[in-house]
A protein has these predicted regions:
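Solvent-exposed soluble domains appended to multi-pass membrane proteins
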Residues: 1-208
Length: 208
């Protein structure tokens, strides 16, 4: 578990080696970049340790962030991230948290676009390691072999919001709790979409 790269992004100045723009120094955005670089370096040292101690080729490495780094609801962060990305920083970027798995001896790579959450990590890793998960209280599913991808999103957005990779939809419920006043985005490019009320209502009911 790494905590340095977590708000409030406090890092000893002796470890903050990135040269930032003057306008970013001391800002939440600037501090975030410094801790990202530091965490990346620390992770590199872990990899070096595994290799040095003959553990790397016998270790499955899984990396996942439990939530986004920069909150778009904070105006100063929203502006900084939009400027940094060169496009609007919206929920499609904020909620896009990667789950990376390295398997020793597997000389191929794959990108899976199935939507999932932390509840799906254990079943995914267990299947890769051929572990039996047929127990009464195992939640989630194997993301690499899932029939669908669906997340009921409740953090930062209202109950009834959802993300589904089946229809490439990211939907946020309206502030009045209705689907009609909500907002629909494409998972593919973040573009705004017209709301199909019947389809969105089905997914929204499921999310609740």
């Amino acid at each position: 578990i790494t905590l340095t790269n977590h708000i409030p992004y406090e890092l000893d100045q002796s470890l903050a080696s990135l040269k930032l723009k003057d306008s970013d120094v001391g800002s939440t955005f600037g501090n975030y970049l410094q801790t990202v670089r530091y965490t990346d370096e620390a992770f590199g040292k872990l990899i070096e340790y595994l290799k040095k101690n003959d553990m790397y080729d016998n270790t499955v490495i899984a990396i996942y962030g439990d939530h986004q780094g920069m909150n778009k609801e904070t105006p100063s962060v929203q502006w900084k991230m939009t400027d940094f990305l060169g496009k609007e920083y919206d929920y499609d970027e904020m909620l896009n948290v990667p789950f990376i798995i390295h398997i020793p001896g597997l000389n191929e790579s794959k990108v899976a676009d199935t939507v999932g959450g932390e509840v799906d990590i254990m079943p995914t890793i267990a299947n890769l390691m051929d572990l039996d998960t047929k127990q009464p209280y195992v939640f989630g599913h194997d993301l690499l072999n899932a029939d669908e991808g669906f997340v009921a999103q409740i953090s930062y957005v209202g109950e009834g919001s959802f993300i589904t990779s089946d229809d490439n939809m990211l939907f946020t419920i309206g502030k009045d709790g209705t689907v009609a006043s909500g907002r629909l985005m494409s998972l593919l490019d973040g573009s705004r979409k017209n709301i199909n009320e019947k389809l969105c209502q089905k997914y929204s009911d499921r999310a609740q």
